[in-house]
């Protein structure tokens, strides 16, 4: 709630729209002992409270078809994780909730392969967004091919650039994903320059103690620029 409150103040001052994203369950972690959540219902109630308190839309990930209806009761947008972006049963279940569906492009896919987002439309839901989150570059790095943003926009869907996840350095021997947060501003500016419809940035008051993804987060004090 503290972070949401601060970001709301920043975005209101800058007169830009803001959507709050939070995971109620971190299902895809590098190690068995990694933090996965505070409990599904408790976390989803926090997301609902963010919406009710600050009046901003909220987003959360779902990982299986049976999660779709549950999560849809609490948030405005359901997000399909990159590693699950082609799972037909997951896409159809999400579509049937009637919520806006944000599909993250798999690191292993070309932008043009994201045409399978039509599965959501064919299931009766035209409210679709796509997210660019980088492409696998060797074993332990990602790069952003900015051509992919207009390519995916050509399908008729808004395209978001996930800045911080695009700067992850996966598959580290430590078992913890690394990152390059010093490049967040550069990647964000480039995404805006090529016409991304929005940018996603993970932020925290102290990334070093964040429960997940701290290595690629932007320190909250730096968010306003």
Question: Predicted regions span which residues?
Answer:
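Active-site mouth loops of central-metabolism enzymes
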Residues: 1-2, 30-38, 56-61, 80-82, ...
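Alpha-helix-loop-beta-strand connector modules within alpha/beta enzyme cores
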Residues: 3-14, 33-59, 94-100, 149-161, ...
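Short, small-residue-enriched loops and turns at beta-alpha junctions
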Residues: 25-38, 66-67, 85-86, 108-111, ...
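Glycine-rich, proline-tolerant flexible connector loops at the mouths of alpha/beta enzymes
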Residues: 1, 18-40, 203-217
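Catalytic alpha/beta core domains of metabolic enzymes, predominantly
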Residues: 97-203
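Short beta-strand segments at enzyme active-site cores
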Residues: 16-23, 57-62, 161-163, 197-206
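Catalytic beta/alpha-barrel core
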Residues: 38-39, 53-67, 76-89, 100-111, ...
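Structured C-terminal cap/extension of enzyme domains
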Residues: 190-225
């Amino acid at each position: 709630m503290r972070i949401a409150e601060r970001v709301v103040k920043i975005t209101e001052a800058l007169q830009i729209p803001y959507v709050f994203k939070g995971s109620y369950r971190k299902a895809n972690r590098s190690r068995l002992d990694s933090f996965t959540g505070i409990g599904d219902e408790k976390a989803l109630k926090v997301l609902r409270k963010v919406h009710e308190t600050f009046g901003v839309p909220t987003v959360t990930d779902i990982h299986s078809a049976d999660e779709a209806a549950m999560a849809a009761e609490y948030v405005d947008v359901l997000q399909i994780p990159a590693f699950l972006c082609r799972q037909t049963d997951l896409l159809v279940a999400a579509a049937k909730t009637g919520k806006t569906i944000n599909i993250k492009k798999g690191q292993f896919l070309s932008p043009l392969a994201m045409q399978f987002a039509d599965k959501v439309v064919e299931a009766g839901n035209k409210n679709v967004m796509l997210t660019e989150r980088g492409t696998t570059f060797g074993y332990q790095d990602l790069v952003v091919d900015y051509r992919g943003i207009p390519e995916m926009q050509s399908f008729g869907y808004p395209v978001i650039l996930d800045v911080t996840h695009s700067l992850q350095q996966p598959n580290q021997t430590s078992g913890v994903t690394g990152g390059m947060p010093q490049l967040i501003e550069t990647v964000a500016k480039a995404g805006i320059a090529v016409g991304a419809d929005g940018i996603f940035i993970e932020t925290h008051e102290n990334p070093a103690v964040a429960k997940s993804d701290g290595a690629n987060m932007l320190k909250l004090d730096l968010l306003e620029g």
